[in-house]
Amino acid sequence: MLFNDNNKKIINNCRKNKFLIAAHRGTVGGNIIPNTTLSFKNALLHGADIVEMDLILSTDGVFYVFHNGEEKKVLSVDKDIRKMSSKEIDELYCYNSLFLKTNKHLERAEDVLKKLKNKCFINIDRSWFYWIEVIRFLDSLNMNDQIMIKSPVDIDLLKKLEASKSSVMYMPIIKNIEEWEIVKQYNINLVAVELIFENLNSKLLSRKIIKEFKDNSILMWANAITLDDTIILSGLLDDNVSIEKGYNKGWGKLFEYGFDIIQTDWPALLKDYRNNI
């Protein structure tokens, strides 16, 4: 593990604000499309400190902000966007939450990221399919004190990140203690860990492990989004529970465990909770 000066800004912001609020693909609904400049602006207006986004790479080497697998829902096409050229992608139209066609197109990542420069922190989620290219691209933007990339724990990805000597902030998706032990072996700029746990008996929530994170200034990220009725990312301390049963039953419990960042689809409500603790 390495500690880079790039990490100081986000760590200090966590301490100042109790915890940080991360907005899942921006804040969307109505005619605001996920993973767009407008969704990210909307998230910031709703109180988010971090916007989460996904990147794909066209066949001719252009990065776009998009979550692959959502092609049919967002673009009304039944084709893997990662197999399209930038010309093909630029010709596609986005569909809104009512599945009505809009005049909006997908946005190129460079344009989106430059608009967010010095405005907030940014988490790059799905991008590990083109790991080396992503790292080089992000390094070229000179925004490494704002941008955090993440990936599943994969030895090949960790080796490539270490070899790149990039100062970009990194956050692994940790599902068990064994994965945490693997990550610790690499000289990478580890700023945070996203902890995935199905129940509160997870060893990742043990006092010993949490103390290790805190002692090493590693931020703890909880994914409180409720994807559906079966996938559990944060031991049922999630958005739906927080809204249905009360903030203290979900987000509040995550805060009590010591989580420094909470990802949500409802940043304004989470900010309301934060303002009142």
Question: Which residue ranges define each predicted feature?
Answer:
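Phosphate-group recognition and catalysis centered on beta-loop-alpha active-site segments
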Residues: 1-277
